[in-house]
Swiss-Prot record:
Entries under HAMAP family matching the protein: Ribosomal_uS10 (MF_00508)
Gene this protein is translated from: rpsJ
Function according to Swiss-Prot or TrEMBL: Involved in the binding of tRNA to the ribosomes.
GO molecular function per UniProt: structural constituent of ribosome; tRNA binding
PROSITE patterns, A to Z: RIBOSOMAL_S10 (PS00361)
Organism name: Leptospira biflexa serovar Patoc (strain Patoc 1 / ATCC 23582 / Paris)
Oligomeric and partner information: Part of the 30S ribosomal subunit.
Lineage: Bacteria, Pseudomonadati, Spirochaetota, Spirochaetia, Leptospirales
Protein name as annotated: Small ribosomal subunit protein uS10
Length: 102
């Protein structure tokens, strides 16, 4: 396992949660002796939904809602067994999606 690269992708709707999670992952990886590249902010996906305010008339009256998905990328280099074990035991907030590839 020594010398491999782990790529961690994070997704969340709240930018504060994702920043806190990236800080915890980077600190854990550095504490175990791995080299960390990142966090790299990826483009934010913005989905906009437009709906009518009234159920029957007033076509001009509309309301818009948006959903932003924030993404971050972290590359962890020169990993060892301690790094992988520490990352698996890490408790992250519920609103953060983590995708780990080696």
């Amino acid at each position: 396992m020594a010398g491999q690269r782990i790529r961690v992708k994070l997704k969340a709707f709240d930018h504060r949660l994702i920043d806190q999670s990236t800080f915890e992952i980077v600190a854990t990886a550095k504490r175990t002796g791995a080299t960390v590249s990142g966090p790299i902010p990826l483009p934010t996906k913005k989905e906009i939904y437009t709906v009518l305010r009234s159920p029957h008339v007033n076509k001009k009256a509309r309301e818009q809602f948006e959903m932003r998905t924030h993404k971050r990328l972290i590359d962890i280099l020169n990993t060892n067994e301690d790094t992988v074990e520490a990352l698996m035991k890490l408790q992250l907030p519920a609103g953060v999606s983590v995708d780990i590839k080696s």
